[in-house]
Amino acid sequence: MDNIEKILEKQELRYVLGTAVSGKPMYLKKKLQKIEYSFTTNITDATKAHSSKIARMMLNNYIQDTGDTESELVIIPLVISYELVKIL
C-alpha cells in the first residue's frame, strides 16, 4: 500500500444495538421491508441508526414486535471511517 495517496477522510457516528448474553458479541439486524429481526456477529451487517434517539426507537420497536426482554440489548456508539484514496 505504498502507492496510495489519501485524498479525503470522513468519519460518521452511528449506533447499533448489541448484546453479549450468548457469551459473544451479537448485533441486531432488521430487514426494513418486514418486521423480521436476526442477530449477527458481523458488526458491518448490523442495522445502524443515525442518532441515539433513533437507536432507542429501534430498541423499543424490537421489544414491542418480538416481546423479547431477555436479550439485554444496549445501544453501542460506533465511529465509521471512510478514506478516499488515489492509487499512484
Annotate each language-model stretch with its function.
Residues 47-88:
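Short, mixed-charge low-complexity intrinsically disordered segments
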Residues 6-7, 25-28, 52-56:
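A short linear-motif detector with a strong N-terminal bias
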Residues 10-42:
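Short aromatic-glycine-(Arg/Gly/Cys) micro-motifs in beta-strand/loop hairpins
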Residues 7-13, 74-76:
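Glycine-rich, flexible loop segments associated with nucleotide phosphate handling
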Residues 1-2, 10-11, 22, 52-53:
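Low-complexity, intrinsically disordered regions enriched in charged/polar residues
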Residues 1-6, 33-36, 60-66:
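Intrinsically disordered, low-complexity boundary segments flanking structured domains
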Residues 1-6, 10, 82-88:
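Short intrinsically disordered terminal tails
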